[in-house]
Amino acid sequence: MTTMFAFLHHLCAFTLVSALAIEFTLIRQELTLASARRLLMTDMVYGIAAGALLVVGLSRVFFFEKGAEYYFHSHAFLTKLSLFIVVGLLSIIPTMEFLSWRGAVRASQVPAIDAKKMRRVTAVIHGELFAIVIILLCAAIMARGGWV
C-alpha cells in the first residue's frame, strides 16, 4: 500500500507541474478563444491535481511512511508544506481570472483582460513555478534525511 500511495503522490505532483507548465505556455501567447478554453480546462486539472496531491501527501504522512512525528520535526518537510500552501493560495489569483472568462467563452468570444491583469496573472504563475522548484529541492533534501 505504501508503494501505491507513493506512486499516486508522484502522479499527482507530475500532473500538477505539467498543468502549471501548460498554463505558463498558454498565458504567454496571444489570448484566443481556443487558448482561453485550454486555460480553463488546464486550470481545472491543476486544481484537481493539487487537491489530490494534498490528500495523498497527508495520507502518507499520517498513515504510511515514517509517521507524522518524523515529518513534523523535519524543517525540509515543513518548508515544503508551507510552500505548497503558499502556491495554493497564489493559484487563486489566476483561477479567479480564468473563471471570470466563462461567460465570454460560452458566448464564443475571446475574453477581455487588460494588460495589468495579464501581467499579474503571469507573475503569479512565475512565482508558483519558482516555489515548486524549491518544493522539489526540499523533497530531495527530505529523501536524503537532511535538514531535520
Residue spans of the language-model regions?
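Polytopic transmembrane helical bundles with strong interfacial aromatic enrichment
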Residues: 1-148
